[in-house]
């Protein structure tokens, strides 16, 4: 009589464990797994970078803060700062992969990518993770717009 072990749920690897632990193909993420929704938000971010940031990159690199402020506002209008923030707070309500796709596209925008990353990761993420409900309702819609 042969017994087989019941399948176990994949565990979450921490830190650099992925370097040391075996992994299955199912645990890997490749661009082929992107959905149409992921591609659409990625295209939106890519067009924003190509059409609105790269043409004025020299001005941004010369610290034209008013221009940077306008571009941050435009990115907010496009929903790029609130990709994975729930709609109830003014976000788009997509998943973390969508947020990753946007961040990847924004990385091609030189120093504006740092501006984008700081706004998204130093203000919005901590507020989502640690803010009270009242703080989220008060601040997130303004930060995302």
What are these regions (language model features)?
Residues 1-37:
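Intrinsic disorder at enzyme termini
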Residues 3, 7-10, 18-19, 42-46, ...:
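A broad, low-specificity signal for short, low-complexity segments enriched in glycine/proline
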Residues 10, 20-21, 30, 40, ...:
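Alpha-helical protein-protein interaction elements
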